[in-house]
Amino acid sequence: MADVVLGVGTGVFIITLIWILTLALTIILSRATGPTKLGIIPVVLLALIITLVLVFFPRAAEVPAPQRAAQIVDMFFIGRYVLLSLVSLVFLAALFMLLPLHFLEPIYAKPLRTH
């Protein structure tokens, strides 16, 4: 049942697409002149046959088989923590390199006004 969208399977979408294309082709062929207009009949019959095959010969069972719960396994667990430790070390190194610049910044005295 992994291919269920909006509660229906892919077959419903295929049938809908087939009939939309059939409708478009019949509209196009109805505007034609002469014997080309008769092309509507095979288009509709082909869509009808495909629809009947999809309805009466489904590939999956009507009741889906019970599925067991999927077990989620983190395969990149060690790599993620190695990456986290490297980023933490770089952050701490940058922090300790910036702290002396912050604390040792000279503060100059303002000159007193003498009258």
Swiss-Prot record:
Keyword terms: Cell projection, Membrane, Transmembrane, Transmembrane helix
Q: What happens when the gene is disrupted?
A: Morpholino knockdown leads to the formation of pronephric cysts and hydrocephalus, features consistent with a ciliopathy.
Q: Name one GO cellular component term.
A: extracellular region
Xref: InterPro entries: Tmem218
Principal location: membrane
Location comes to:
Membrane; Cell projection, Cilium
Q: How does it sit in the membrane?
A: Multi-pass membrane protein
Q: Which GO terms describe its biological process?
A: cerebrospinal fluid circulation; pronephric glomerulus development; regulation of heart looping
Membrane-crossing residues? 8-28, 38-58, 81-101
By sequence similarity, the record places it as follows: Belongs to the TMEM218 family.
**Function (record text):** May be involved in ciliary biogenesis or function.
Q: What is this protein called?
A: Transmembrane protein 218
The source organism is: Danio rerio
Lineage, top ranks: Eukaryota, Metazoa, Chordata, Craniata, Vertebrata
